[in-house]
Amino acid sequence: MTVEERQGRVGGHGVSGGGGGRDQFPVGMRVLAVDDDPTCLKILENLLLRCQYHVTTTGQAATALKLLRENKDQFDLVISDVHMPDMDGFKLLELVGLEMDLPVIMLSANGETQTVMKGITHGACDYLLKPVRLEQLRTIWQHVIRRKNCDAKNRGNDDDAGQKAQGMNNEGESIGANRNKRQSRKSRDENGDDGDDSDENSNENGDSSTQKKPRVVWSVELHRKFVAAVNQLGIEKAVPKKILDLMNVENITRENVASHLQKYRLYLKRLSTDASRQANLAAAFGGRNPAYINMNSFGNYNAYGRYRTVPTAGHTQANNILTRMNSPSAFGVHGLLHSQPIQLGHAQNNLSTSLNDLGGLNNGNMIRGAQMSTILTGPSGNSFPNISNGAPLATANRSLQPLESSSQQHLSRVHSSSADPFSTLVGESPQFPDLGRTTNTWQTAVPSNIQDRGHNDNMSQATLHMNGPKIEPVSSFTSSNQIPLLGNEMQGQVASLASNVPIAFNQDTSPFNYGSSTNSRDMLNNSHVFSNSSINTSLPNLSLDNPAVPKQTLDRGNTGIVSPMQDGRIHHQAVSNQLNYNDDLMRTTGLQRGLSGGLDDIVVDMFRPDREDDGVPYIDGDWELV
């Protein structure tokens, strides 16, 4: 059906038919369909007819616009394609929305979000995708009802708004006229001017009332006047009106003063809160002046004693493997270690060592300045069972020789058994050539002023001073995994054993990781306990089991009289490992580089005053006993 036929139908019975079918809405709803594709237009027409709509079709947007302008009231809905050759569908949408205010549904095969959004923002009430379905077309009548309801509501609102505006204008005119009359009369009575001048003044007053009031800037001088007025009246009795009178400043209203007074009161309240908080803090810390609260906490700081320089600070990094072996906190945690007495002759010394820190041991100075508690436990007069007297040992590759019988106390070299994996690894390792020489350099780390006595080619002996039970002399011994020596299971670092320090451990030992833990036994009733150390290695199958006897002398075979301990410290003629008496339970903590010790020991040493009154000199690198 052509456009002309459609126009005749609309102008003829189509209108009457539409008018007759208005009672059965949406049956007979008038729809204008616009599409440049004849096939799509034909399908759309058939679907609309199946919905019992009156349909008018056209293939050009310009023709549809002309038809709408000529018959504005003859259509209820417009369905238009987006892409048309003569005119874009969005342009047609804008024109229909501006001129006819009809609901327009956009139809397109492009379902992109941007295209749909563009159609909705231009005023389309719906956006349908081709091919159109019958179910979608059966519900398009909702847009017609929605548009009519919105139009009716807008018309009603416009009418109401117009009536209200008209009434307000009338009232405003009457009020304005009355006000102008009163002002004109007052001005004539006061000034005696003409009516024209009064009218001009009234107009000026009306203009000034509509102007925005200038903002008040509180300068320093203005604030000083405000504060002076508040202080004169009192903060409790200060009100904006009285403050304004006392200030006597122009261009300031009571509202400005009231706002500033409120801010000023909040400021004073905040100051009082801060002051009370500082006072409470000062009272809590015992200070008198709140300004010195932070310094008050140091009032009794001198009770801890004065600082002193630890003389061995420079030796603790490389040479001092054990620096605090005589401190209670350098040993086992309280209550976690064994506390029963130790019997002599049934335990072995388990040493498993790693070589991370052995690179810093120069010429056997492994325990320089370190005091070690190598203490024995047992009844007085006990001897070492299972050890016979005979000749001293020679090398690590030889078998166990008889121990020689004499009153001398010697400490020969600590030898590893041939089956020991540590000996095998050290002897065969190409990276540590000096570690394999077990027959050369196992010496005692003693001060330089002590004479080195060689019972064999490279042996050192030291005089041992102690107060305690006498112990049978032992000449020399060798190490194996099962030799029962002392009645305490010593687990310690290589440096913790008296006179068991390798001199040639100055090679590069960075591949190893040195970690140690130290523990000890309780000391009861003037009995002495061995200091036990355990040195673990990060290398697999790397262990060293060396029983050791930390009791030696440097006398040439003369035992003499055992001298007592002197004030718990090392003398010039004393070996680094003296017997020390402690009656505290031991605790272990970690020091730097995996050593044993505690922070409390360091703090006690730092705050302990120097004891130089007794005149006893220290060996270089020695720490005080706690």
UniProtKB/Swiss-Prot annotation:
Compartments, as annotated in UniProt: Nucleus
Q: Does the keyword Nucleus apply?
A: yes
* Post-translational modifications: Two-component system major event consists of a His-to-Asp phosphorelay between a sensor histidine kinase (HK) and a response regulator (RR). In plants, the His-to-Asp phosphorelay involves an additional intermediate named Histidine-containing phosphotransfer protein (HPt). This multistep phosphorelay consists of a His-Asp-His-Asp sequential transfer of a phosphate group between first a His and an Asp of the HK protein, followed by the transfer to a conserved His of the HPt protein and finally the transfer to an Asp in the receiver domain of the RR protein.
Q: From start to end residue, where is composition biased (Acidic residues)? A: 191-202
Q: What range(s) does the Response regulatory domain occupy?
A: 30-145
What is the purpose of this protein?
Answer: Transcriptional activator that binds specific DNA sequence. Functions as a response regulator involved in His-to-Asp phosphorelay signal transduction system. Phosphorylation of the Asp residue in the receiver domain activates the ability of the protein to promote the transcription of target genes. May directly activate some type-A response regulators in response to cytokinins.
Q: Which PANTHER family match?
A: TWO-COMPONENT RESPONSE REGULATOR, TWO-COMPONENT RESPONSE REGULATOR ARR10
Q: What is the protein's name according to its record?
A: Two-component response regulator ORR24
> Origin organism of this chain?
Oryza sativa subsp. indica (Rice)
Record gene name: RR24
